[in-house]
Amino acid sequence: MYKRQAVARYPLHTLQSIVSFSYAGASPALMGACAQREIGLAFCSPRGKFLARVAGQAQGNVLLRRMQYRVADDPSQSCRVAGMMIFGKVYNAKWSVERTRRDHAMRIDESRFSAVSDQLQGLLPQIAAETSLDSLRGLEGIGAAAYFSVLDDMILQGKETFFFRERSRRPPLDAFNALLSFAYSLLAHDCASALESVGLDAYVGYLHRDQPGRESLALDLMEELR
């Protein structure tokens, strides 16, 4: 509603999630309908900072959660699960680099992209064989640094205001980092909602270990998509 006029109407069955910014609200009836239909409903500040999420009744699969906790308490099993997530992240990064190399070969330094792709490819068997969480995090960091080294070259338009130099957070120092932080906030909300909808505990992760107030498993799930 804007000035008591309906701007648009959307059937709930066509929506997967709703994100409300600024001072726009939601009626109790809408929140209840979203919870009943497992439609994620999140509220963010005018600057895009995540504030709260409305969720329906948590799934009551206690056996699944017990298994999740047992795996999280076992370093070797935690490493195996975390390794699959990091493998997916590096694999996706490699093919993002390859796609840019294929589609925009005339606009980039192809030799740099080829070198980064080869470096990411070389990390994959190391990740698959790794049995230490700390070493996995180190390999993930190497892969991220390689990907970020060509990320600015993948931005092909609007470079005068939209560019990447280095990752910055709290606060992001440029438009690109602001977009990354904003997108990660929305993605974290979607991942946490998806985990809760199948009965998993979003706060107990494998790569990201326990930290009060942090949805560690949601952050784990995000890795392949970052």
Task: Spell out what each predicted region is.
Residues 6-12:
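Short, basic/hydrophobic alpha-helical segments
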Residues 14, 21-95:
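A surface-exposed, charged beta-strand/loop segment in the N-terminal or early-internal portion
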Residues 16-22, 173-177:
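Conserved interaction-surface patches within small, structured recognition/assembly domains
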